């Protein structure tokens, strides 16, 4: 069994900052999400992470056709779609922190079935807020050395 030794290295460039969120949570972010995120945020996430555009949209539960319509229309996601993208950003930042800033390892972990999640992938849990909380709670348990 491998032993996890946490380091307290803080990400110098978290995803939430890269995509232009004022913070990772709070009333200002909530107002931005309710207004609708610009569709260009998907490109920013893709450039920062190792996830492709299709993967990001799938994980966020946004159909490619809806994305295409948003691109040719107002250029913004709906409030609901924006919340789902923010959920992905939040969880991905926590996963990258878990792996001490290694985005590749975090992405691999997100795609692997995890025992602590009932042998489903963390990315598949992001379709609901409670699933995302389960993933973030698992990350917290791992960071604190609680076997999951």
Swiss-Prot record:
InterPro entries (UniProt xref): Antitox_Xre, Xre-like_HTH, Xre/MbcA/ParS-like_toxin-bd
Keywords: Toxin-antitoxin system
Pfam family, one: Xre_MbcA_ParS_C
GO molecular function: DNA binding
Disulfide-linked positions: none
Oligomer and partners: Homodimer. Forms a complex with cognate toxin Rse.
Role description: Antitoxin component of a type II toxin-antitoxin (TA) system. Neutralizes the NAD(+) depleting activity of cognate toxin Res.
Family statement drawn from the similarity comment of this UniProt entry: Belongs to the MbcA/ParS/Xre antitoxin family.
The name this protein goes by in its record: Antitoxin Xre
């Amino acid at each position: 069994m491998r032993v996890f030794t946490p380091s307290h290295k803080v990400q110098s460039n978290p995803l939430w900052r890269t995509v232009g969120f004022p913070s990772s949570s709070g009333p200002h972010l909530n107002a931005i999400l309710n207004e609708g995120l610009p569709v260009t945020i998907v490109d920013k996430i893709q450039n920062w992470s190792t996830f492709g555009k299709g993967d990001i949209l799938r994980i966020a539960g946004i159909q490619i056709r809806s994305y295409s319509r948003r691109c040719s229309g107002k250029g913004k996601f709906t409030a609901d779609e924006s919340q789902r993208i923010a959920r992905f950003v939040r969880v991905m930042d926590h996963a990258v922190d878990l792996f001490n800033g290694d985005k590749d390892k975090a992405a691999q972990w997100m795609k692997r079935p995890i025992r602590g999640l009932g042998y489903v992938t963390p990315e598949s849990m992001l379709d609901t807020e409670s699933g995302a909380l389960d993933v973030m709670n698992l990350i917290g348990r791992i960071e604190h050395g609680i076997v999951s």
